[in-house]
């Protein structure tokens, strides 16, 4: 303490850190206060809880005391911080976050910087201006940050301003549209050679945009540099009269038409398959599931044509090779035999008539030997009818055919196309009503070999 200077009132502030303990404020004269006696007093130690942080503020920079942390009654010394004379701040609100005008801290005194001529002048003071409205960052209020390219908000009632006709859209200035115009100039140029300076003038664009197009086209080998400012087209022909481009367009159109036709055929096949399924599964249609000879001949498309009827088991394989000269059909089946019939043309003289024995297909069953005997007994004469003997007009037919192979009616609707059996496969025999003369009535007995010849052989 300097001589001649009135001692100032000092303030000793003791606060409890960590939210524990209470603040103890003691004020005394600097000359008569013993700091060490105050910290060591029993009442002061009892008021502070363990872990309490003690800070003492004083105006005398030479005064050495301590800011201690009490741990189970132990006390350690530390440096002191000066306080502001003439102020008595509340211990509960000091060094806390300010909440408004009521919690403002008046003055906070800082210790003088060392080396200022012995500290003779008044200490430096700094005022904390936190404002009346609280935190300094909240004093201006919340503001939305402004975006650099954000458009101004438009009220819903304000009408949209239409663009003027002179303004160009983004597509008009795009590089793709410019490339199409550049290709049109190439197609109109002779021999596919184009001057880039002329192209820039015609298209009314900068020359660097033309270079952007030529660099890409040259990279994919569609053009090549003829000279400094001339390029030549290297792709397909661009003329409309002919060339590869017109041919490709024609082929694309043809493929589209064929695809539509194929789609139409697929729909027809599905429709026919569904109709056939409904016809075959219906019980009312099963009794009518047959085709007669008259039904086949009534088809106008089969008029004056040879009709072959194939009766084959299920899963029969039919192959028709692509041949221009002659038509061939290959049939193969592993489920059973295949029967092939020729459907002859219908004539006026020999019109088939349905009899009592004729089935619903128009076919007449083959008569047995008993039926032939009953028919022969009904006639007055004993001779065999000419109609039954007509196929036996020659000896060759007699030797190659038997009774079961002789057709009962030559006017039948179908003719069997199977090859006849060989002579060794026939067993000649006579019926019950036939005699030995029936075997030789059509033969010339003079031409028959003698019995001796049979004996010698």
From Swiss-Prot:
Q: Where is this region: Leucine-zipper?
A: 196-217
Q: What is its main location?
A: nucleus
Look up the DNA-binding region in the UniProt entry and give its residue ranges.
Answer: 147-237
Q: Compositional bias (Low complexity) spans? A: 155-164
Q: Per the record, which residues fall in region Disordered?
A: 80-171, 350-387
Domain of life according to the entry: Eukaryota
The listed location of motif DEF box is 201-237
What ranges does the record give for the region Dimerization, renumbered to this chain? 238-329
Which GO BP terms sit in this record? G1/S transition of mitotic cell cycle; negative regulation of fat cell proliferation; positive regulation of cell population proliferation; positive regulation of DNA-templated transcription; positive regulation of vascular associated smooth muscle cell apoptotic process; protein import into nucleus; regulation of DNA-templated transcription
Q: What is this protein called?
A: Transcription factor E2F3
| Similarity annotation | Belongs to the E2F/DP family.
Which is an annotated GO molecular function term of this record?
A: DNA-binding transcription factor activity
Can you state the subunit structure given in the record? Component of the DRTF1/E2F transcription factor complex. Binds cooperatively with TFDP1/Dp-1 to E2F sites. Interacts with retinoblastoma protein RB1 and related proteins (such as RBL1) that inhibit the E2F transactivation domain. Binds EAPP.
Annotated region (Retinoblastoma protein binding), positions in chain: 424-441
In UniProt terms, what function does this protein have? Transcription activator that binds DNA cooperatively with DP proteins through the E2 recognition site, 5'-TTTC[CG]CGC-3' found in the promoter region of a number of genes whose products are involved in cell cycle regulation or in DNA replication. The DRTF1/E2F complex functions in the control of cell-cycle progression from G1 to S phase. E2F3 binds specifically to RB1 in a cell-cycle dependent manner. Inhibits adipogenesis, probably through the repression of CEBPA binding to its target gene promoters.
Q: Where is this region: Transactivation?
A: 383-457
Q: Where is this region: Cyclin A/CDK2 binding?
A: 96-145
Q: Where are the compositionally biased (Polar residues) regions?
A: 93-102, 371-387
* GO CC terms: cytosol; nucleoplasm; RNA polymerase II transcription regulator complex
Location(s), subcellular: Nucleus
Q: Which UniProt keywords apply?
A: Activator, Cell cycle, DNA-binding, Nucleus, Transcription, Transcription regulation
